[in-house]
């Protein structure tokens, strides 16, 4: 069976790197200090006691006490002089150095921990945000998008919200939209021009457009601002999707015979309880034995992985598949022997890059972050191949149940960049936490994106040995 599961109930170590090691944590915010001083000289003796034999413990302590005390006094006297000397040197350097010397604790944090533990680590916190940022759209639209997304952070300020800054952001976005109208519409294919023009008008003057958003901000109504902002960002995303009519990069020659998805697709998965129980009802809803989740799969960032998954869905490969719940994930059983499939290379798009990396995980130690992060509740990714972590499983996928409590202060999963994430749950996320081992995928359907799915006629050149 493919990793992260080595059997239906045993999970590979890859999926359990979710808790920071005590060895990793203990170096965070550690200040330099002397090995021991007067307050811990007793501790030193206790450590010495713990290493002595049972028969000679008392004699050893008695014989060493006087020697230790004298040496401690000598050491402490010298250490105080040393501390004064170090303090003098630091003051001298502080005065003459152009750089401040605060934040010395960062020297004790490895590059990986600096990213994982930094509260300023900027990764999308929702699937919708990650998917919107992943669209390879016109630069003007990206400027508009960034200006509006900044308002989302400003709205989180509990008191004295900076409405003036919010208004400036919207006006900046509006100016770019008006000044670059021709560039924005020129990026849209001819057959979609009419729809693009309609969306552009909505963005400027529509009910959920930028002008209306400025009005809401002037009224200083945070609820209306939030609703208007969401509507404007949805319109921005719709325009960007029209501009991104296909892949913005060429696939490597060796992967041209793989199924691929050149854009977005939507998959609807119906899950059925196996033990006769029911899913908890939503507000005003009824108890039900089956529930539906929708996921958006992203071929812009993971065309091979999303394409292979879409192919399996359309062939009915997941219909009737059993689900297993493991630590922070819901994963399908291994069904690679039941369907014709091949292992797809590990595929991760680094943030700021124009094409994915293949068979190479991201190095968080070097500050690399993925366009589609795993650290989002409801992220959908392929498990590893049972033969090599450079490849994804040909069949097994999992829903990642992200929990901030099991992540670094920066909100990153400790497995970030190690799996091929290819989509996010956009509807039915409340269902994921209710799934139990043994529940069944009743059906999986590709309800949108069939026209973007390419299925090569011949797959003879695909290496199936992985």
Curated annotation (Swiss-Prot):
Please provide, alphabetically and separated by semicolons, the GO molecular function terms listed in this UniProt record: peptidyl-prolyl cis-trans isomerase activity
Name the source's superkingdom: Eukaryota
Q: Where is the transit peptide?
A: 1-65, 66-114
Q: Which GO terms describe its cellular component?
A: chloroplast; chloroplast thylakoid; chloroplast thylakoid lumen; chloroplast thylakoid membrane; cytosol; thylakoid; thylakoid lumen
EC class name = isomerase
Question: What biological function has been recorded for the protein in this entry?
Answer: PPIases accelerate the folding of proteins. It catalyzes the cis-trans isomerization of proline imidic peptide bonds in oligopeptides.
Could you identify this protein by its name?
Answer: Peptidyl-prolyl cis-trans isomerase CYP37, chloroplastic
**Which lineage?**
Eukaryota, Viridiplantae, Streptophyta, Embryophyta, Tracheophyta
Gene that encodes it: CYP37
């Amino acid at each position: 069976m493919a990793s992260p599961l080595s059997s239906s109930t045993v999970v590979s170590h890859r999926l359990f790197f979710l808790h920071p090691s005590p060895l990793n944590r203990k170096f965070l915010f550690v200040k330099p200090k002397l090995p021991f001083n007067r307050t811990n000289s007793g501790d030193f003796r206790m450590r010495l006691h713990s290493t002595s034999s049972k028969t000679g413990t008392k004699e050893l302590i008695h014989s060493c006490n006087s020697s230790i005390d004298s040496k401690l006094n000598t050491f402490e006297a010298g250490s105080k002089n040393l501390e004064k000397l170090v303090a003098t040197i630091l003051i001298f350097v502080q005065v003459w150095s152009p750089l401040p010397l605060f934040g010395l604790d960062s020297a004790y944090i490895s590059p990986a921990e600096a990213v994982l533990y930094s509260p300023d680590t900027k990764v999308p916190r929702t699937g919708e945000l990650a998917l919107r940022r992943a669209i390879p759209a016109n630069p003007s639209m990206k400027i508009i998008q960034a200006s509006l997304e900044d308002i989302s952070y400003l709205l989180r300020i509990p008191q004295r919200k900076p409405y003036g800054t919010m208004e400036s952001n919207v006006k900046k976005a509006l100016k770019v939209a008006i000044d670059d109208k021709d560039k924005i519409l020129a990026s849209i294919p001819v057959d979609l021009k009419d729809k693009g023009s309609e969306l552009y008008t909505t963005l400027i003057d529509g009910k959920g457009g930028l002008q209306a958003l400025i009005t809401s901000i002037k009224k200083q109504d945070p609820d209306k601002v939030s609703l208007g902002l969401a509507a404007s960002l949805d319109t921005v995303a719709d325009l960007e999707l029209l501009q991104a009519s296909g892949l913005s990069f060429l696939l490597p020659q060796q992967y041209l015979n793989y199924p691929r998805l050149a854009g977005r697709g939507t998959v609807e998965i119906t899950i059925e309880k196996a033990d006769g129980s029911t899913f908890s009802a939503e507000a005003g809803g009824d108890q039900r034995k089956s529930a539906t989740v929708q996921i958006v799969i992203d071929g812009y960032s993971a065309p091979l992985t999303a394409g292979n998954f879409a192919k399996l869905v359309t062939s009915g490969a997941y219909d009737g598949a059993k689900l297993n719940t493991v630590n922070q994930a819901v994963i399908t059983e291994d069904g690679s022997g039941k369907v014709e499939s091949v292992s797809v290379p590990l595929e991760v798009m680094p943030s700021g890059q124009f094409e994915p990396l293949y068979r190479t995980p991201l190095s968080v130690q070097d500050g690399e972050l993925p366009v589609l992060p795993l650290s989002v509740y409801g992220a959908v990714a392929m498990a590893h191949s049972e033969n090599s972590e450079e490849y994804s499983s040909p069949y097994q996928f999992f829903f990642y149940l992200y929990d901030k409590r099991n992540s670094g202060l920066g909100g990153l999963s400790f497995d970030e960049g190690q799996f091929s994430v290819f989509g996010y749950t956009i509807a039915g996320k409340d269902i994921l936490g209710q799934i139990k081992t043994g529940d069944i995928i009743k059906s999986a359907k590709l309800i949108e994106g069939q026209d973007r799915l390419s299925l090569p006629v011949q797959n003879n050149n695909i290496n199936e040995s992985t």
